[in-house]
Amino acid sequence: MKRQRAIELDRVKKTMLNIDWDDALGDEEVPELEIIATDKIPPREPTLSGYEPAVSVRSLRDNELDDHLKRQRSLLTRLGDKLADKGEKIRNRIGELEYEKQRRMFQQRTKMQDADNGCQILEKPKSSDVFMRASTASKDTSGQGTSGSKDVSRSTFAAHFSDNLKMGPQPVKLVNDKLQDLGRGSWISKANRDSIIEKNNVWRSLPRLSKCKVSLKNFYSESKDPKGDRRPNEAYGKGKPNESSPYLLVDDDDGDDDKVIGYETPRHWSLKASPLQSSSCRKKSDDKVINLDEDEPLSPMVVEEACELPEGLPEDIYYPSSDQSDGRDLVQVSLKDLKCLSPGEYLTSPVINFYIRYVQHHVFSADKTAANCHFFNTFFYKKLTEAVSYKGNDRDAYFVKFRRWWKGFDLFCKSYIFIPIHEDLHWSLVIICIPDKEDESGLTIIHLDSLGLHPRNLIFNNVKRFLREEWNYLNQDAPLDLPISAKVWRDLPNMINEAEVQVPQQKNDFDCGLFLLFFIRRFIEEAPQRLTLQDLKMIHKKWFKPEEASALRIKIWNILVDLFRKGNQTD
């Protein structure tokens, strides 16, 4: 029966479908595609690295590009296996930086060839050459053997392709469908479209990228650079906050001068208050601890507006003033030092040393705890490591010379000693806690690192050796009247505790200096006059919100601008 039915179906008469192709296609000729270089370039897609506030690789100078590469490789080596994504974002960032470095080399070589040949039109390299150069440059970035650093997207190719279109309008014959699709720019409007795979050019399938809802804007509203020139994108815009960000990112105006297609430029940004969410433990008056598994909204964090940098400011200022200090802790800050307070920049020693003195002389000038603290500057730890590792025959004389760093101060009479550490393009903090006479638990060393990047055991060992050397030196003289238990002082080399604490972690790779400064400030606010081992519980992962530390960038900027203005009035 089934066979008979199948035969009957085969006997059904098949008719031909008639299509009027002339009516369907029309008589109009398809115009030849022209690619025209314009002044305004569409905004780029989000960076492959996933860091929205990342520094634009195009805006970096050559030496800054090398510094960023060095830092990213160091981060990948130390933290790659510890991160949730196994360092994928860092490898992508390394790939972008390596490609930008190769692009500059290629552009410079092309210009030199044009100068030799007297040509005015740049020769367009083959697409395969471009991608093979980029993939070769990415192979040596991480040394991890993964494919993350070898990735080159079509967005990157578009950026290179558009750089060479600086001549007038001219017809271009596209080679194939892939380039035709790229030339029309249709790939830009398809935010969820997978990147095309080209195996022979070492492409790989990239994850789907959602279109960036907001762009970044410099928080310097109508600010000027140190020379008085007005910065681009000066006025604040209005935009909607990114829900996943603790900041309110302000959208840019149409006057975007970025000249790169293909991925998001970290434009100038503005920080405003935005509601945050986090899980927390709240302690009620009856000492009952309630753990909240679900996230709860927190009150908005108030962030200052960055003030304008006026013209005609002095080149340098000195802090603190002569009436606040005897001159031994004087810090010099120049206008060019303010650049490190730009978004995405790493804080430098002059700014960090300034804010440490500012906290000491202004914020906590009347605080008893701060008054009994000693603050070393950012250059001290390097000298400390040299002193404790010195192997010469004049070791004692070398240490006596090293003691000039705290001449006139008896360190063991202090409550706390703060030592900033700068190694491997990263900042962390050591706090030495001196107990009182009733506490026989010994001295305590705390290391606070917002990335966990610095070798804690090595730092503990260096600081211990430093304290033992100072103890040996002081024990040569008559007994001292110190606020330390006699039992602890007699056996001090063996009475030094290492406190392993967990602290809030930064959400990027450039706020480590801000976290160092916020560690100092928050510690002085909450620490007792003399710390015990039981007091260490105040330091934990939820000690403060990372956004609070990041917000110091604008605070310090405003403080310094105000001091420069006052310095100008004094002059």
UniProtKB/Swiss-Prot annotation:
Give the gene symbol: ULP1C
- For this UniProt entry, what's an example GO CC term? nucleoplasm
Region feature Disordered, mapped onto this chain:
221-260
Where's the active site on this chain? H426, D449, C512
SS bonds (residue pairs):
none
What is the species listed in this Swiss-Prot or TrEMBL entry?
Arabidopsis thaliana (Mouse-ear cress)
Q: Where is the composition biased (Basic and acidic residues)?
A: 222-233
Q: Which GO terms describe its molecular function?
A: deSUMOylase activity; SUMO-specific endopeptidase activity
Q: Which Gene Ontology biological process is one annotated for this entry?
A: vegetative to reproductive phase transition of meristem
Which family is it part of? Answer: Belongs to the peptidase C48 family.
Q: Which PROSITE patterns match?
A: ULP_PROTEASE
Q: Does the keyword GTP-binding apply?
A: no
Q: State what protein this is by name.
A: Ubiquitin-like-specific protease 1C
Protein purpose: Protease that catalyzes two essential functions in the SUMO pathway: processing of full-length SUMOs to their mature forms and deconjugation of SUMO from targeted proteins. Cleaves precursors of SUM1 and SUM2, but not of SUM3 or SUM5. Able to release SUM1 and SUM2 from conjugates, but unable to cleave SUM3. Protease activity mainly directed at deconjugating SUM1 and SUM2 from their target proteins. Regulates salt stress responses and flowering time. Redundant with ULP1D.
Comment field on protein domains: The N-terminal regulatory domain is not required for peptidase activity in vitro.
Subcellular location, record wording: Nucleus, Nucleoplasm
Q: What happens when the gene is disrupted?
A: No visible phenotype in terms of overall growth, salt sensitivity and flowering time. Early flowering time and salt sensitivity in ulp1d/ots1 and ulp1c/ots2 double mutants.
Note the InterPro entries from the entry. Papain-like_cys_pep_sf, Peptidase_C48_C
Class of the enzyme per the UniProt entry, highest EC level? hydrolase
